[in-house]
Amino acid sequence: MTVTAPRLAVVTIARGRHAHLAGQIRGLRAQGRGPDVYVVVAIDDPQVHDVAGRLSPADWDLRRPGTGLRDGRMPLSAARNLGASTAIGAGAEHLVFLDVDCVPNPTLVARYGEILADAPGVGGPRVVCGDVAYEPPPSLPGAGADGRPRHHPARPPLPASAVRAVEDVSLFWSLSFAVTARDFTRVGGFDEDYLGYGAEDTDFGQRLARSGGQLLFVGGAGAVHQYHPSPSPPVQHVADIVVNANVFADKWGWWPMQTWLEQFRDRGLVHRRLDGRWETNDGAAPGPDGPGAAPAPLEGAARGQATSRTTSTLPRVALE
């Protein structure tokens, strides 16, 4: 009897980055096993759907939901949740999330599908992350003489057959990960209180831990993050980062992105209020109702976001 593999969806979200989306589609077309469903969520950018429709093969089940900005800010969490619900509605049991900047290696879809199919079906949810290498700037030679993409030092590549459990859930990055539809629902998806850039990945890791789940790093599911310029620290997102850091600290009782916040402070961009909260020096981001930053193209989630469990002056929120 032939056993049919569970239906697998690749989900990406995009605003701008049309050339990078085209690169991702080329990478998906080169897979040994392609996606059964391809979900491309456009954020305030109808051209994203045009690119996906023009370049995706006719035999793919292409789904193209969309969402707008919220208070002038990018609803990254809500867009990912919309992508997941669209994929599940199309019958997908396995979900692979790829940042729009990421081009999958030829074995990524098959490897993620293999790992998810081996899920025990009991215990807490599992989230699986493959490694991501970063394409160097076109004018620079890269890390080595061959100019090949470089891996983040916190995420060195694993052998193709390796599976490694990771205790530090703050190492979860949404650039490339896979999860069963059931486990995504058990985690609760991404928290939609976060708007714009920053902290939503760290929050998802905390949700995974709270649900009794496990983070796994695997080999054989690599991707390449296509280059785009991004300053460090990401000063273009300072307002979003301050708002989202406060949201996170209210919820979890410790500060994410501590290094970035301190670097912003050293540059005179932010300060700590007497109550312990962070605020931009123009007062633009005192909390989640602040005006936020002007919209920017979708960032590739660095995610060099440093996290810190330094206790804030806010009350620690107990994990449920």
Q: Where are the regions that the model predicts?
A:
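Short, well-formed alpha-helical segments that are part of the catalytic scaffolds
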Residues: 17-30
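Short beta-strand-to-loop acidic/aromatic patch adjacent to the donor-nucleotide binding site
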Residues: 92-103
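A short, conserved alpha-helix in the catalytic core of glycosyltransferases
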Residues: 171-179, 183-188, 193-221
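Active-site donor/metal-binding and catalytic loop motifs
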Residues: 217-234, 248
